Amino acid sequence: MRFLHLSDLHLGKRVCEFSMLEDQRYILEEILTLLDETPVDGVLLAGDLYDKPVPPAEAVRLLDWFLTQLATRKLPVFAISGNHDSADRVAFGAALLADSRVYVSPVFTGAPQPIPLQDAHGTVDVYLLPFLKPAMVRHVWPDEPIESYNDALACVLRHCTPDPGHRSVLVAHQFVAGAAACESEEPSVGGVDSVDAALFDAFDYVALGHLHSPQKVGRETLRYCGTPLKYSFSEAGQCLSLIHISEPTRR
């Protein structure tokens, strides 16, 4: 099964007070052209769809246009909110969107549930995990000892056990320890928000957002795709990632 893994669109972003919306629409059009030329079975949007929790109306219209274009191509879309997004705003209309196979992570209320896809090899379960903070997880499991981002993610994934007979894809938006950050990302003091890559070991592919540089972390199938549009000089030369998952075993 083949997915296009995208993240960190940051729609509505301004760089030095210059609106990037025209450039963002251009890159989304290029992505649609890529999808027309290279068919995929689904699109993964790993958070930071917008640049701000309250995006400008033009950014909302641009995301609406992009999701509509994906839906008209009969492509299932799997989207989560990132740290720049308002989870409530991103999740608005999620039940209605699901009727068009546009699956959006709800506001965090517990362990994500699988969304199944079928192909000739069997079932692929997609799990949507929006950006997590420790307080969110403590609210759901108040008796758990959660002091850090790592504790929070570990708690959630203890309650989310993929079916070993299915291929599994997790879409998440966290900073994984050992990954390389770029200058345009929000700084973290002392890596306080980092999580251990080993926490994701139960999943065959982990589609990460948050960091703007495309990279793997540890294994080949734990990846940041990077941002499709560049927001700093340190991001020059980056490209999109096209992910192909074809077997029920980890690759």
Name each model feature, range by range.
Residues M1-T68, T72, L170:
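N-terminal active-site segment of His-dependent metallophosphoesterases
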Residues D8, L28, D48, L63, ...:
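Divalent metal-coordination and catalytic microenvironments
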Residues D41, P76, Y103:
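Residue-level detector of anion-binding/catalytic polar loops
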Residues P55, H84-T221:
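His/Asp/Glu-rich metal-coordinating catalytic cores
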Residues A71-A79:
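Short, surface-exposed connector motifs at secondary-structure boundaries
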Residues G209, T227-Y231, C239-L242:
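Glycine-rich, charged/polar anion/phosphate-binding loops
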Residues K216-R219, S234-Q238:
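Short glycine/proline-enriched turns and hinge-like loops at secondary-structure junctions
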Residues I243-R251:
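Residue-level detector of conserved catalytic or cofactor/ligand-binding positions
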